[in-house]
Design a protein with these regions (language model features):
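Juxtamembrane helix-boundary/capping and inter-helix hinge elements in multi-pass membrane proteins
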Residues: 13-18, 28-32, 65-76, 102-109, ...
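Re-entrant/interfacial helical elements at transmembrane boundaries that shape
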Residues: 6-7, 19-24, 53-65, 94-104, ...
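Membrane-interfacial loop-to-helix junctions in multi-pass transporters
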Residues: 25-40, 68-76, 199-201, 233-239, ...
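Long, contiguous bundles of hydrophobic transmembrane helices that form the permeation core
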Residues: 113-227
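Membrane-interface helix termini and inter-helical loops of multi-pass transporters
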Residues: 21, 97-108, 180-194, 222-223, ...
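Hydrophobic alpha-helical transmembrane segments of multi-pass integral membrane proteins
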Residues: 2-12, 28-61, 85, 240-246, ...
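Juxtamembrane and boundary regions of transmembrane helices in multi-pass small-molecule transporters
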Residues: 69-71, 106-155, 325-378
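Core transmembrane alpha-helical segments of multi-pass membrane transporters/permeases
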Residues: 1-19, 195-257
Length: 378
C-alpha cells in the first residue's frame, strides 16, 4: 500500500496534477478567498503526495498570491500548510493513517469517513482562520529567490476533473465497500465492491489510471514512468522500517504483559481509549519529532491494550484519528518539517514556533476533538 501510494503520488506530482488543482481552485474562489482554496488544495493533494513534495510544488503559488495582493506570505502559506498537514495525517491513502488502521485492524472506509470530518474542521481552524491572524501579526515578504519566478504555464497542465476523478477512485471504492457491508439492500453487489474496495486493489486501479491518464496520454514513455515510480519508492524504506518497529513494539507489549499493565492503569483513570491514544501520540511526537514514528509507536501501544478488538469499527476509526491528531501537534526543533517550513518561507526559528508550531497543534487538537465527539456515537 505504501509503495503504491508513493508511485501514485509521484505520477500526480510530475504531471502537474497538484498545480492544476491549486490554480483551478484559486480561480474559482478568487484572490480574496484564495486562502481557503489553498487549504482545500493542500488537503486533497497531501492524500496521495508526500507532505514535503506537495509543499515544494504548491508554495510558489502561495508566494505569487502574496506578491499580487501585497499581503504577508503567511496569509496564504499557513492555509496551504494546514491543508497539507491534515491530508498527510488524517485521510488515507496517505501512509500514516493506513499504517495505524492496519495495526488496529479497522476498515479503511470508516477511517476515510472519520478522517474527512476531522480534517475539514482542522483545516478551517488551523488554515484560513489562523493564517489570517498570522498574516496580520507577522509580515513576511515573499523570498527573493522566488519573487521573480515565471508564471505557471496552464496550457501544459492536465485537466482538473481528470485529476479529481483519479484521486477519488481509491476513496470511493473503499467507502463503497464499507457501505455495502452495512446496507442490506446492497448485498447483491457487495462481493464486487468487496474486491474492488480492497485497499490494495483500489490503489492499484488508481495508479494504473494515473499512469495512463496523466502519464502516457501526456507524452511520458513507459521507461520515463518507470524511472519516476522507481524513484518514488526511495522514501518508503524508512516508513516500512518504522512500521515494522511499531509492529514489534505492539507484540512486545502484548506478550510481555505490559499492555495489560497499561490497560489496568488506564482503567483506573477512567480514560476512554480515544483520549489515551491521543495522549500517547502527543508524548511520542514531542519526544521523537517524526509524525510517522509517533503514529506507529502510539498505534503499537494502543493495539496491545486489552479489549481493543471488541470496539466498534467507528470507534476504532475515531481512535485512528486521535492517534493522527496527537502525532501532529507540537512540531519543533526535532521535526524535519519544522526546518523545511522555516527554510522555504524564509523566517527565523522564533517566528516558525509562533506560526507553524501553533498551526500544527491546532490541526492535531481540532481533529482530535472532532474524533472525540464522533466517538460518543460509536
Amino acid at each position: 500500500l505504501v509503495g503504491l501510494g508513493s508511485m501514485f503520488g509521484a505520477i500526480l506530482e510530475v504531471s502537474g496534477g497538484a498545480q492544476t488543482i491549486a490554480v483551478t481552485m484559486v480561480k474559482k474562489f478568487g484572490d480574496e478567498k484564495a486562502a481557503w482554496a489553498l487549504g482545500i488544495t493542500g488537503l486533497v493533494i497531501a492524500m496521495p503526495v508526500f507532505f514535503d513534495a506537495g509543499l515544494i510544488i504548491l508554495i510558489p503559488l502561495a508566494f505569487s498570491l502574496a506578491k499580487k495582493t501585497k499581503r504577508s506570505s503567511l496569509h496564504y502559506v499557513i492555509p496551504l500548510l494546514a491543508g497539507l498537514a491534515v491530508g498527510h495525517a488524517f485521510i488515507p491513502p496517505t501512509p500514516g493513517p493506513v499504517l495505524v488502521a492496519t495495526m488496529l485492524n479497522v476498515d479503511l472506509g470508516w477511517v476515510i469517513l472519520v478522517g474527512i470530518f476531522c480534517g475539514i474542521f482542522a483545516m478551517i481552524v488551523a488554515g484560513p482562520v489562523w493564517g489570517s491572524i498570522c498574516g496580520k501579526k507577522f509580515y513576511v515578504p515573499v523570498p527573493e529567490s522566488v519573487a521573480n519566478q515565471e508564471e505557471i504555464d496552464e496550457s501544459k497542465l492536465p485537466s482538473f476533473w481528470l485529476i479529481v476523478g483519479i484521486i477519488l477512485i481509491p476513496l470511493v471504492l473503499i467507502i463503497l465497500d464499507s457501505i455495502c457491508g452495512v446496507v442490506p439492500a446492497l448485498a447483491g453487489v457487495a462481493p464486487v465492491f468487496e474486491f474492488l474496495g480492497e485497499p490494495f486493489v483500489a490503489l492499484l486501479l488508481a495508479t494504473l489510471a494515473a499512469m495512463f491518464g496523466l502519464g502516457l496520454k501526456h507524452g511520458y514513455t513507459m521507461k520515463e514512468l518507470e524511472k519516476v515510480m522507481t524513484k518514488s519508492l526511495e522514501p518508503t524504506g524508512l516508513i516500512l522500517l518504522v512500521t515494522a518497529c511499531g509492529g514489534v513494539l505492539r507484540y512486545v507489549l502484548q506478550y510481555s504483559g505490559l499492555g495489560n499493565v497499561i490497560g489496568n492503569a488506564v482503567a483506573s483513570m477512567n480514560l476512554p481509549i480515544v483520549i489515551l491514544a491521543f495522549i500517547i501520540a502527543v508524548l511520542v511526537r514531542i519526544s521523537v519529532g517524526s509524525a510517522t514514528v509517533a503514529m506507529t509507536m502510539a498505534a503499537g501501544i494502543v493495539a496491545a491494550l486489552p479489549g481493543i478488538s471488541e470496539l466498534s469499527p467507528l470507534y476504532l476509526a475515531c481512535t485512528v484519528a486521535a492517534v493522527a491528531g496527537g502525532s501532529t501537534v507540537c512540531s519543533h526543533f526535532n521535526d524535519s518539517g519544522f526546518w523545511l517550513v522555516r527554510s522555504l518561507v524564509g523566517i527565523d526559528e522564533k517566528t516558525t514556533l509562533k506560526t507553524w508550531t501553533i498551526m500544527e497543534t491546532l490541526v492535531g487538537v481540532t481533529g482530535f476533538l472532532v474524533a472525540l465527539v464522533i466517538s460518543f456515537f460509536a
